[in-house]
Amino acid sequence: MATLYIVRHGQASFLAENYDLLSPMGEAQSRLLGQYWSSRRLRFDRVCAGPRVRHKDTVKLVHAAYEAAGLDLPEVQTVPEFDEYPAEAVMKFGLPILLDLDTRVRDLHAAFLHSAEPKERQATFQRLFEIVIAKWAHGGLHLEGVETWPEFCSRVNAGLDQFLSAGGTAAIFTSGGPTAVALQRALDLSAQRTLEASWMVRNSSWSEFLYSAK
């Protein structure tokens, strides 16, 4: 049996102008992950990352921790199939549609705009985000030119098929969505459970799978 580690990136810059950058906390989380793995002498045959800055910067900080410990990490491949689902596009184009149709969305959006306390603002946005993304995932939002949920899952699974075919101990640095698709693949989760899992995966955590290479 071979082993796969799927890592969610360190904390990104939530509600900042550029979400894709690691926050100072995200950088610290990534360093700690690298220090922990290197302290356990965990070695990989292959490592890849999704295409986002937050994916690549997380693995760079893990790599730096390995170098500091005198250990090697394989050259990192960038695999576009392990990008996150198109959350930004869904929110940009889907939210205005739901603001016209759903009272609950309008109320949450108003509460978000008027909330001054950071934790309250973050919690309100998360509830709003989950409603809009769930509507899209279940086919309730048809957004021209935006990847659908089934297309997203197919993309990630195609990446997994290709990356896992070589076997060995492998690591993928990605986001919560692709991690959840791997969980769906292993546990036969429903679409709703898969979506919920994508929101539960913690920053810089890893999910570990045993698999048979094809």
Q: Can you name each region flagged by the protein language model?
A:
Residues 10, 176-177:
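Active-site metal-binding loops of divalent metal-dependent hydrolases
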Residues 4, 163, 168-174:
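Generic beta-sheet signal
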Residues 54, 178-179:
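Alpha-helix capping/helix-boundary segments
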Residues 3, 10-64, 147-153:
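Loop-to-helix element that buttresses phosphate recognition and phosphoryl-transfer chemistry
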Residues 35-126:
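Phosphate-coordination/substrate-recognition cap region in phosphate-metabolizing enzymes
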Residues 190-213:
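Domain-level recognition of soluble alpha/beta enzyme cores
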Residues 18-19, 87-93, 184-185:
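Short aromatic-enriched loop/helix-cap "lid" or pocket-rim segments at secondary-structure transitions
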Residues 113-158:
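Alpha-helix-centered segments that form part of catalytic cores
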